[in-house]
Amino acid sequence: MIFKQLFEPESSTYTYLIGCRDTGRAVLIDPVRETIDRDLAALRELDLTLQYTLETHIHADHITSAARLRSLTGCKVAYPEMDGLACADVAVSEISPLDVGGVRLQPLFTPGHTDAHHAYLVDIPGAPHIFTGD
């Protein structure tokens, strides 16, 4: 697995880039509009193709770059199914994990920050990672 944590200082939010070394496919979790050029540069630098953007929740503190990334790269936009967004290409839930090449992201319903908030578990043997958003 390829992993990169990216920080956006204006909104104090993190974007996570996760990639599969074997397939060259990647996902950006919680991408931010103001940092789209940085994110695209990171994908190029790592020789990755963006397969998905994935949100932990609908954000009030920043604007997602998901739609713009979809138009630039052809990636699919994934959101928690409970959000019921018509603009999402893929709906994820605890029973619908997201596979990015050989990397599986398991959605975990974690209400609190928002009513439909989800975290994502990448269960790498010996080194599990969980991405919680904000």
Per-range role (PLM):
Residues 1-48, 120-133:
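Conserved beta-strand hairpin/beta-sheet module of binuclear metal-dependent hydrolase folds
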Residues 12, 33-109, 128:
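Active-site HxH/HxHxD metal-binding segment of metal-dependent hydrolases
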Residues 18, 30, 57, 69, ...:
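Divalent metal-coordination and catalytic microenvironments
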Residues 64-65, 118-120:
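Active-site-flanking alpha-helical
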Residues 102, 114, 122-124:
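Generic secondary-structure microfeatures
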